[in-house]
Amino acid sequence: MAGAPEGVDPSVPNVARMYDYFLDGKDNFAADRAAAEEILKKFPHTKEGARANRDFLRRAVRYLVDAGIEQIVDLGAGLPTQGNTHEIAPQARVVYVDYDSVVCVHGRALLARKENVDFLQADVREPDVLLGKLRGLIDFDKPVAFLMLALLHFIEDEHAYDLVAKLRAASVPGSYLVISHAVDPTPDITPQALEIYKKSTAQLNLRTREDIERFFEGYELAEPGLTFPARWRPDEEKPLGDNITFGYVGVARKL
């Protein structure tokens, strides 16, 4: 990445830019790459997990389109990359949300000429403010899908469950919630990984399967339920692969 925009400290690792590095992107700084490499030393399959997460996004959005969803809010969208939500669902109203100024600058530049697509800067830890901004862009009298891919494990419990509850309350029946969430694959080395993220722009909050299931209260999970990314409605032509326990994913419809 070229020089840092005003107000951005390139010496502090940024989780969105680290994720970009895991996806072999170019929008990252030396500090991001160094922190990402430290994570890869502890979790060698992190890049594979990031790709599995993007593959899940593609399949989940296709599912939403087939279910008739015409409005999608992609929370914690991250830096633009290939296979963005609006590309998978070109007829849908798509609003990307991220709190990071670099992410928003890149997103708005990429989407400047795109119709029916917006990039909103907001902090998901302030759901009331977020909803106020979304109401000018989304019709909450109609079903809407909220995507939270690789987001909630960067939010503390008090904010994470409150966010999901308030979005659920604001949406009508027939709306959807899509989540991917990291789990604790290797308890003996996880504390070291947590220390790395403490030096970045967001701390890691790993949860159990039961904790993740709580996010779906008031929703009905679509088959195959809460499962590993590669096992959620996999493409027939694409084999599962060996390393599929990066976290849990689910797509659910509000009752």
Language-model-derived ranges and their functions:
Residues 151-154, 182-186:
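Short "lid" loop at the C-terminus of a central beta-strand within the Rossmann-like core
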Residues 203-226:
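Short alpha-helix
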Residues 1-122, 126-140, 168:
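Rossmann-like AdoMet
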Residues 145-147, 164, 170-182:
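Conserved beta-strand signature within the Rossmann-like core of class I S-adenosyl-L-methionine
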Residues 231-255:
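Core SAM-dependent methyltransferase catalytic element
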Residues 124-125, 134-161, 167:
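A short SAM/SAH-binding and catalytic strip from SAM-dependent methyltransferases
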